[in-house]
C-alpha cells in the first residue's frame, strides 16, 4: 500500500527589506590642543580638592598686589583677595580681609586639615592643598606660590568651608 507522496513544500523565503545604510560613526570636533590657563571654575561643589585644583592653576599666573582682587592672568591679588576669588568661583562668599575670613566656616585642627581648608595666620591666609602644604598669594616678589604651612609664620587657625 503506497501513499501518495505529500506535495513538496518549500519554506517561504523570508521577507527581506532593503538593507538600511550603516549609521555614520559619530564624530565630534577635535578638542583644542591647548586650553587657556587657568581654566574656568567648575560649577559649585562641596569638594575641597576641586577648590585646590582651581587654586593651583593660578600659581605663577597672577601677581601679588596689596589690596588687590583682580584674579586674572597678569592681574593682581593679595592673600585674602586670592582666597576670596577662589572660593567665590565655587559660590562661597568671603570678605576681602584675612582677619575676617578666620570667622567663616567650621574650625578644624591641624590634624583634621583637608584639601581646600583655609590656613589662617595673623595678617595672612592661604588654602591647604594637602601634605602639609598650602597655596597662597605670598608677596610682591613671589606672587601666588606653594609653601609649607609653617613657611614663615605660625598659623592661628584652620577653617573648613566645604
Predicted features along the sequence, with ranges:
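Intrinsically disordered, low-complexity
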Residues: 1-63, 153-154, 161-162
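Residue-level signal for alpha-helical context at structural boundaries
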Residues: 21, 36-38, 69, 73, ...
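Aromatic- and glycine-rich peptidoglycan recognition patches
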Residues: 27, 47-48, 53-56, 92-108, ...
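Catalytic cysteine-centered active-site loop
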Residues: 57, 61-115
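Short beta-strand segments that buttress and anchor functional surface loops
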Residues: 116-121
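A conserved glycine-rich beta-strand in the N-terminal activation segment of trypsin-fold
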Residues: 124-126
Amino acid at each position: 500500500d503506497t501513499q501518495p507522496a505529500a506535495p513538496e513544500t518549500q519554506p517561504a523565503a523570508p521577507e527581506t527589506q532593503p538593507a538600511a545604510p550603516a549609521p555614520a560613526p559619530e564624530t565630534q570636533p577635535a578638542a583644542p590642543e591647548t586650553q587657556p590657563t587657568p581654566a574656568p571654575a567648575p560649577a559649585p561643589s562641596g569638594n575641597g580638592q576641586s577648590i585646590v585644583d582651581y587654586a593651583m592653576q593660578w600659581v605663577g599666573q597672577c601677581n601679588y598686589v596689596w589690596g588687590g582682587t583682580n584674579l586674572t592672568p597678569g592681574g593682581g591679588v593679595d592673600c585674602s583677595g586670592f582666597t576670596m576669588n577662589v572660593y567665590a568661583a565655587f559660590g562661597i562668599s568671603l570678605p576681602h580681609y584675612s582677619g575676617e575670613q578666620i570667622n567663616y566656616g567650621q574650625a578644624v585642627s591641624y590634624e583634621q586639615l583637608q584639601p581646600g581648608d583655609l590656613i589662617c595666620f595673623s595678617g595672612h591666609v592661604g588654602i591647604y592643598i594637602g601634605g602639609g602644604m598650602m597655596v597662597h598669594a605670598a608677596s610682591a616678589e613671589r606672587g601666588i606660590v606653594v609653601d609649607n604651612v609653617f613657611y614663615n609664620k605660625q598659623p592661628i587657625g584652620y577653617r573648613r568651608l566645604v
